[in-house]
Protein backbone atom coordinates (compact mmCIF):
# COMPACT_ATOMS: atom_id res chain seq x y z
CA UNK A 1 0.00 0.00 0.00
CA UNK A 2 1.27 3.44 -0.95
CA UNK A 3 0.68 6.39 1.33
CA UNK A 4 0.99 9.90 -0.11
CA UNK A 5 2.42 12.33 2.38
CA UNK A 6 1.93 16.04 1.81
CA UNK A 7 -0.53 18.90 1.84
CA UNK A 8 -4.11 18.06 0.83
CA UNK A 9 -5.17 19.63 -2.46
CA UNK A 10 -8.69 20.16 -1.12
CA UNK A 11 -8.88 23.80 -0.04
CA UNK A 12 -11.43 24.84 2.61
CA UNK A 13 -14.48 26.42 0.99
CA UNK A 14 -15.15 30.11 1.32
CA UNK A 15 -18.48 31.62 2.32
CA UNK A 16 -19.54 32.22 -1.30
CA UNK A 17 -18.78 28.64 -2.36
CA UNK A 18 -20.63 27.25 0.66
CA UNK A 19 -23.68 29.40 -0.10
CA UNK A 20 -23.51 28.45 -3.77
CA UNK A 21 -23.46 24.75 -2.88
CA UNK A 22 -26.43 25.09 -0.54
CA UNK A 23 -28.54 27.37 -2.78
CA UNK A 24 -28.05 25.33 -5.96
CA UNK A 25 -28.32 21.89 -4.35
CA UNK A 26 -30.65 19.40 -6.05
CA UNK A 27 -33.81 19.40 -3.93
CA UNK A 28 -37.58 19.10 -4.38
CA UNK A 29 -38.00 22.89 -4.68
CA UNK A 30 -34.97 24.55 -6.24
CA UNK A 31 -33.85 27.70 -4.40
CA UNK A 32 -30.86 29.13 -6.25
CA UNK A 33 -29.46 32.63 -6.05
CA UNK A 34 -32.61 33.91 -7.76
CA UNK A 35 -34.62 32.49 -4.86
CA UNK A 36 -33.08 35.09 -2.55
CA UNK A 37 -35.06 37.67 -4.54
CA UNK A 38 -38.06 35.57 -5.60
CA UNK A 39 -39.22 33.91 -2.39
CA UNK A 40 -39.16 36.90 0.02
CA UNK A 41 -40.70 39.26 -2.55
CA UNK A 42 -43.42 36.79 -3.58
CA UNK A 43 -44.19 36.07 0.10
CA UNK A 44 -44.51 39.76 0.98
CA UNK A 45 -46.52 40.64 -2.16
CA UNK A 46 -49.04 37.84 -1.64
CA UNK A 47 -49.14 38.40 2.11
CA UNK A 48 -49.75 42.11 1.63
CA UNK A 49 -52.53 41.41 -0.87
CA UNK A 50 -54.30 38.90 1.38
CA UNK A 51 -53.95 41.27 4.35
CA UNK A 52 -55.32 44.24 2.41
CA UNK A 53 -58.27 42.44 0.84
CA UNK A 54 -59.21 40.92 4.19
CA UNK A 55 -58.90 43.86 6.58
CA UNK A 56 -58.03 47.20 4.98
CA UNK A 57 -60.57 49.81 3.87
CA UNK A 58 -60.26 52.22 0.94
CA UNK A 59 -62.51 54.79 2.58
CA UNK A 60 -59.69 57.27 3.18
CA UNK A 61 -58.24 57.03 -0.36
CA UNK A 62 -61.21 56.31 -2.67
CA UNK A 63 -64.30 56.58 -0.46
CA UNK A 64 -64.94 52.88 -1.03
CA UNK A 65 -65.33 49.64 0.88
CA UNK A 66 -62.72 47.18 -0.39
CA UNK A 67 -62.23 44.39 2.18
CA UNK A 68 -63.95 41.19 3.22
CA UNK A 69 -64.35 42.75 6.67
CA UNK A 70 -66.57 45.45 5.13
CA UNK A 71 -68.71 43.01 3.15
CA UNK A 72 -66.85 42.65 -0.15
CA UNK A 73 -66.41 39.31 -1.89
CA UNK A 74 -63.50 37.91 -3.93
CA UNK A 75 -64.53 39.84 -7.04
CA UNK A 76 -65.02 43.22 -5.32
CA UNK A 77 -62.26 43.23 -2.68
CA UNK A 78 -59.04 45.05 -3.56
CA UNK A 79 -55.84 46.61 -2.30
CA UNK A 80 -56.45 50.18 -3.43
CA UNK A 81 -54.01 52.79 -4.68
CA UNK A 82 -52.97 55.67 -2.43
CA UNK A 83 -54.85 58.98 -2.54
CA UNK A 84 -54.16 61.40 -5.38
CA UNK A 85 -52.73 63.92 -2.92
CA UNK A 86 -49.86 61.55 -2.10
CA UNK A 87 -48.56 61.75 -5.69
CA UNK A 88 -45.60 59.39 -6.20
CA UNK A 89 -44.59 58.92 -2.57
CA UNK A 90 -43.15 55.47 -1.86
CA UNK A 91 -45.25 55.52 1.33
CA UNK A 92 -42.63 53.79 3.45
CA UNK A 93 -43.94 52.68 6.83
CA UNK A 94 -41.26 54.78 8.53
CA UNK A 95 -41.73 57.72 6.13
CA UNK A 96 -43.13 61.18 6.91
CA UNK A 97 -46.69 60.20 5.94
CA UNK A 98 -47.26 57.21 8.25
CA UNK A 99 -44.43 57.89 10.76
CA UNK A 100 -44.28 54.25 11.83
CA UNK A 101 -48.02 53.93 12.52
CA UNK A 102 -49.10 50.69 10.79
CA UNK A 103 -52.82 51.50 10.93
CA UNK A 104 -52.27 54.94 9.42
CA UNK A 105 -49.98 53.40 6.78
CA UNK A 106 -52.75 51.01 5.71
CA UNK A 107 -55.32 53.81 5.65
CA UNK A 108 -53.09 55.92 3.38
CA UNK A 109 -52.68 53.10 0.84
CA UNK A 110 -49.20 51.98 1.85
CA UNK A 111 -50.09 48.36 1.14
CA UNK A 112 -50.51 49.16 -2.56
CA UNK A 113 -46.95 50.41 -3.04
CA UNK A 114 -45.76 47.50 -0.87
CA UNK A 115 -47.55 44.91 -3.04
CA UNK A 116 -46.67 46.61 -6.35
CA UNK A 117 -42.94 46.90 -5.71
CA UNK A 118 -42.53 43.47 -4.09
CA UNK A 119 -44.68 41.98 -6.87
CA UNK A 120 -42.49 43.52 -9.59
CA UNK A 121 -39.28 42.26 -8.00
CA UNK A 122 -40.90 38.87 -7.38
CA UNK A 123 -41.71 38.54 -11.09
CA UNK A 124 -38.16 39.56 -11.99
CA UNK A 125 -36.89 36.96 -9.51
CA UNK A 126 -39.01 34.30 -11.21
CA UNK A 127 -37.52 35.20 -14.59
CA UNK A 128 -34.00 35.03 -13.11
CA UNK A 129 -34.93 31.63 -11.65
CA UNK A 130 -35.68 30.39 -15.16
CA UNK A 131 -32.35 31.77 -16.41
CA UNK A 132 -30.51 30.10 -13.53
CA UNK A 133 -32.14 26.70 -13.95
CA UNK A 134 -31.71 26.81 -17.73
CA UNK A 135 -27.99 27.44 -17.27
CA UNK A 136 -27.73 24.64 -14.70
CA UNK A 137 -29.25 22.00 -17.00
CA UNK A 138 -27.74 23.50 -20.18
CA UNK A 139 -30.97 24.70 -21.78
CA UNK A 140 -31.48 27.80 -23.87
CA UNK A 141 -33.03 30.74 -21.97
CA UNK A 142 -36.19 31.09 -24.08
CA UNK A 143 -38.51 30.40 -21.12
CA UNK A 144 -37.09 33.39 -19.30
CA UNK A 145 -37.25 35.52 -22.45
CA UNK A 146 -40.92 34.54 -22.90
CA UNK A 147 -41.67 35.51 -19.28
CA UNK A 148 -40.33 39.00 -20.00
CA UNK A 149 -43.69 39.65 -21.72
CA UNK A 150 -45.84 39.46 -18.55
CA UNK A 151 -43.16 41.39 -16.63
CA UNK A 152 -43.20 44.18 -19.23
CA UNK A 153 -47.00 44.43 -19.01
CA UNK A 154 -47.01 44.46 -15.18
CA UNK A 155 -44.27 47.08 -14.92
CA UNK A 156 -45.78 49.32 -17.61
CA UNK A 157 -49.33 49.20 -16.21
CA UNK A 158 -48.68 49.28 -12.47
CA UNK A 159 -45.51 51.39 -12.32
CA UNK A 160 -44.66 53.33 -15.49
CA UNK A 161 -48.21 54.51 -16.28
CA UNK A 162 -48.87 56.08 -12.85
CA UNK A 163 -45.34 57.54 -12.87
CA UNK A 164 -46.27 59.37 -16.07
CA UNK A 165 -49.53 60.57 -14.51
CA UNK A 166 -49.95 62.67 -11.38
CA UNK A 167 -49.60 59.84 -8.86
CA UNK A 168 -50.04 56.18 -7.92
CA UNK A 169 -53.76 56.99 -7.60
CA UNK A 170 -54.20 56.44 -11.35
CA UNK A 171 -52.68 52.94 -11.36
CA UNK A 172 -54.98 49.89 -11.11
CA UNK A 173 -55.90 48.72 -7.63
CA UNK A 174 -55.17 45.03 -6.97
CA UNK A 175 -58.59 43.43 -7.33
CA UNK A 176 -60.85 41.93 -9.99
CA UNK A 177 -63.54 44.64 -10.16
CA UNK A 178 -60.82 47.26 -9.63
CA UNK A 179 -59.01 46.07 -12.75
CA UNK A 180 -62.31 46.24 -14.69
CA UNK A 181 -62.77 49.85 -13.54
CA UNK A 182 -59.23 50.61 -14.70
CA UNK A 183 -59.98 49.14 -18.14
CA UNK A 184 -63.03 51.42 -18.44
CA UNK A 185 -60.84 54.33 -17.34
CA UNK A 186 -58.27 53.51 -20.04
CA UNK A 187 -60.99 53.43 -22.67
CA UNK A 188 -62.69 56.64 -21.60
CA UNK A 189 -59.57 58.75 -21.10
CA UNK A 190 -57.22 57.23 -23.71
CA UNK A 191 -59.50 55.52 -26.28
CA UNK A 192 -57.33 52.45 -25.65
CA UNK A 193 -59.24 50.03 -27.90
CA UNK A 194 -58.39 52.15 -30.95
CA UNK A 195 -54.69 52.23 -30.05
CA UNK A 196 -52.59 50.22 -32.56
CA UNK A 197 -50.43 48.80 -29.75
CA UNK A 198 -53.54 47.44 -28.04
CA UNK A 199 -54.59 45.92 -31.36
CA UNK A 200 -51.22 44.20 -31.68
CA UNK A 201 -51.53 42.93 -28.11
CA UNK A 202 -54.99 41.47 -28.75
CA UNK A 203 -53.74 39.86 -31.97
CA UNK A 204 -50.80 38.37 -30.07
CA UNK A 205 -52.77 36.93 -27.15
CA UNK A 206 -55.73 35.62 -29.15
CA UNK A 207 -53.43 34.46 -31.93
CA UNK A 208 -51.37 32.54 -29.39
CA UNK A 209 -54.51 30.87 -28.03
CA UNK A 210 -55.46 29.84 -31.57
CA UNK A 211 -51.96 28.51 -32.28
CA UNK A 212 -51.98 26.58 -28.99
CA UNK A 213 -55.34 24.96 -29.78
CA UNK A 214 -54.30 24.11 -33.35
CA UNK A 215 -50.96 22.70 -32.22
CA UNK A 216 -52.46 20.50 -29.50
CA UNK A 217 -55.20 19.22 -31.79
CA UNK A 218 -52.74 18.49 -34.60
CA UNK A 219 -50.41 16.47 -32.37
CA UNK A 220 -53.37 14.48 -31.02
CA UNK A 221 -54.69 13.96 -34.55
CA UNK A 222 -51.42 12.59 -35.91
CA UNK A 223 -50.56 10.04 -33.22
CA UNK A 224 -49.45 6.90 -35.02
CA UNK A 225 -48.47 4.81 -32.01
CA UNK A 226 -50.68 4.73 -28.95
CA UNK A 227 -51.55 2.38 -26.13
CA UNK A 228 -54.30 -0.23 -25.95
CA UNK A 229 -56.86 1.98 -24.22
CA UNK A 230 -60.24 2.87 -25.68
CA UNK A 231 -59.34 6.53 -26.09
CA UNK A 232 -56.33 8.84 -26.16
CA UNK A 233 -56.42 9.60 -22.44
CA UNK A 234 -56.60 5.96 -21.30
CA UNK A 235 -53.90 5.02 -23.76
CA UNK A 236 -51.55 7.83 -22.75
CA UNK A 237 -48.28 6.62 -21.22
CA UNK A 238 -46.23 9.38 -19.58
CA UNK A 239 -43.09 7.20 -19.40
CA UNK A 240 -42.91 6.66 -23.15
CA UNK A 241 -39.69 8.27 -24.33
CA UNK A 242 -39.97 8.10 -28.10
CA UNK A 243 -41.96 10.46 -30.27
CA UNK A 244 -45.23 8.99 -31.50
CA UNK A 245 -46.74 11.61 -33.79
CA UNK A 246 -46.07 12.31 -37.43
CA UNK A 247 -44.78 15.76 -38.40
CA UNK A 248 -44.94 14.70 -42.06
CA UNK A 249 -48.65 13.86 -41.80
CA UNK A 250 -49.36 17.14 -39.99
CA UNK A 251 -47.47 19.08 -42.65
CA UNK A 252 -49.44 17.40 -45.44
CA UNK A 253 -52.76 18.07 -43.66
CA UNK A 254 -52.18 21.80 -43.14
CA UNK A 255 -50.67 22.18 -46.60
CA UNK A 256 -53.98 20.96 -47.99
CA UNK A 257 -56.04 23.15 -45.60
CA UNK A 258 -54.19 26.47 -45.94
CA UNK A 259 -51.80 25.90 -48.82
CA UNK A 260 -48.87 26.51 -46.44
CA UNK A 261 -47.60 24.70 -43.35
CA UNK A 262 -44.65 24.66 -40.97
CA UNK A 263 -41.90 22.48 -42.38
CA UNK A 264 -39.98 21.88 -39.15
CA UNK A 265 -40.64 21.90 -35.42
CA UNK A 266 -38.08 24.55 -34.56
CA UNK A 267 -39.78 27.22 -36.72
CA UNK A 268 -43.23 26.11 -35.55
CA UNK A 269 -42.41 26.42 -31.86
CA UNK A 270 -40.46 29.65 -32.32
CA UNK A 271 -43.56 31.12 -33.97
CA UNK A 272 -45.69 29.99 -30.99
CA UNK A 273 -43.19 31.78 -28.73
CA UNK A 274 -42.92 34.88 -30.91
CA UNK A 275 -46.64 35.66 -31.33
CA UNK A 276 -47.74 36.05 -27.67
CA UNK A 277 -44.49 37.57 -26.38
CA UNK A 278 -44.43 40.17 -29.14
CA UNK A 279 -48.09 40.95 -28.47
CA UNK A 280 -47.43 41.49 -24.76
CA UNK A 281 -44.42 43.68 -25.47
CA UNK A 282 -46.41 45.78 -27.93
CA UNK A 283 -49.13 46.27 -25.29
CA UNK A 284 -46.49 47.34 -22.77
CA UNK A 285 -45.04 49.86 -25.24
CA UNK A 286 -48.54 51.22 -25.83
CA UNK A 287 -49.13 51.71 -22.10
CA UNK A 288 -45.81 53.58 -21.82
CA UNK A 289 -47.16 55.83 -24.56
CA UNK A 290 -50.34 56.40 -22.54
CA UNK A 291 -48.21 57.33 -19.53
CA UNK A 292 -47.02 60.23 -21.68
CA UNK A 293 -50.62 60.92 -22.82
CA UNK A 294 -49.92 59.99 -26.45
CA UNK A 295 -53.19 59.68 -28.33
CA UNK A 296 -54.61 56.78 -30.33
CA UNK A 297 -56.05 57.18 -33.82
CA UNK A 298 -58.20 60.30 -34.22
CA UNK A 299 -60.57 60.50 -37.18
CA UNK A 300 -61.29 64.20 -36.79
CA UNK A 301 -63.04 64.56 -40.15
CA UNK A 302 -65.73 62.10 -39.01
CA UNK A 303 -66.14 63.97 -35.70
CA UNK A 304 -66.54 67.31 -37.49
CA UNK A 305 -69.06 65.92 -39.95
CA UNK A 306 -71.04 64.23 -37.14
CA UNK A 307 -71.15 67.54 -35.27
CA UNK A 308 -72.45 69.35 -38.37
CA UNK A 309 -74.80 66.70 -39.77
CA UNK A 310 -77.37 65.17 -37.37
CA UNK A 311 -77.95 62.26 -39.76
CA UNK A 312 -74.27 61.27 -40.02
CA UNK A 313 -72.90 58.91 -37.39
CA UNK A 314 -70.32 56.10 -37.47
CA UNK A 315 -69.32 53.48 -34.93
CA UNK A 316 -66.25 55.64 -34.31
CA UNK A 317 -68.24 58.77 -33.49
CA UNK A 318 -70.58 56.76 -31.26
CA UNK A 319 -67.54 55.41 -29.38
CA UNK A 320 -66.13 58.92 -28.97
CA UNK A 321 -69.42 59.98 -27.35
CA UNK A 322 -69.29 56.94 -25.08
CA UNK A 323 -65.77 57.93 -24.06
CA UNK A 324 -66.99 61.42 -23.22
CA UNK A 325 -69.71 59.87 -21.08
CA UNK A 326 -67.19 57.69 -19.28
CA UNK A 327 -65.03 60.73 -18.56
CA UNK A 328 -67.94 62.85 -17.39
CA UNK A 329 -69.31 60.23 -15.01
CA UNK A 330 -66.09 58.58 -13.89
CA UNK A 331 -64.09 61.73 -13.20
CA UNK A 332 -66.71 63.08 -10.80
CA UNK A 333 -67.10 59.73 -9.01
CA UNK A 334 -63.44 58.70 -9.04
CA UNK A 335 -61.96 62.05 -8.02
CA UNK A 336 -64.36 63.48 -5.43
CA UNK A 337 -61.60 65.73 -4.10
CA UNK A 338 -61.75 67.71 -7.37
CA UNK A 339 -65.42 68.64 -6.74
CA UNK A 340 -66.26 68.15 -10.42
CA UNK A 341 -69.87 69.04 -11.33
CA UNK A 342 -71.17 68.63 -14.88
CA UNK A 343 -74.49 70.27 -15.82
CA UNK A 344 -76.97 68.03 -17.59
CA UNK A 345 -76.73 69.98 -20.84
CA UNK A 346 -73.02 69.19 -21.33
CA UNK A 347 -73.33 65.45 -20.78
CA UNK A 348 -72.86 63.71 -24.15
CA UNK A 349 -75.79 62.46 -26.21
CA UNK A 350 -75.77 60.59 -29.52
CA UNK A 351 -77.19 62.16 -32.67
CA UNK A 352 -80.11 59.71 -32.53
CA UNK A 353 -81.49 61.31 -29.34
Swiss-Prot record:
Annotated GO biological process: photosynthetic electron transport in photosystem II
Annotated positions binding Fe cation: 215, 269
Reaction(s) catalysed by this chain's protein: 2 a plastoquinone + 4 hnu + 2 H2O = 2 a plastoquinol + O2
The keyword Iron is assigned to this record: yes
Residues noted as binding a plastoquinone in the record, renumbered to the chain: 215, 262
Cellular location(s): Plastid, Chloroplast thylakoid membrane
Other remarks in the entry: 2 of the reaction center chlorophylls (ChlD1 and ChlD2) are entirely coordinated by water.
Protein name from the UniProt record: Photosystem II D2 protein
Organism: Marchantia polymorpha (Common liverwort)
Amino acid sequence: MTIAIGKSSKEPKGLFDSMDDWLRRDRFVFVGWSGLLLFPCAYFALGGWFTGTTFVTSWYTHGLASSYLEGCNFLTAAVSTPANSLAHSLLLLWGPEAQGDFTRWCQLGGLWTFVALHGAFGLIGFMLRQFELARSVQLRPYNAIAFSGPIAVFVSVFLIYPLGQSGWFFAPSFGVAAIFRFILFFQGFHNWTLNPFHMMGVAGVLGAALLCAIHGATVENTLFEDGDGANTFRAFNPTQSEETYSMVTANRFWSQIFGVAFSNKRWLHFFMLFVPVTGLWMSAIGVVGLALNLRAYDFVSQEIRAAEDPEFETFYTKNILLNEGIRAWMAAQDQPHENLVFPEEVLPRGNAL
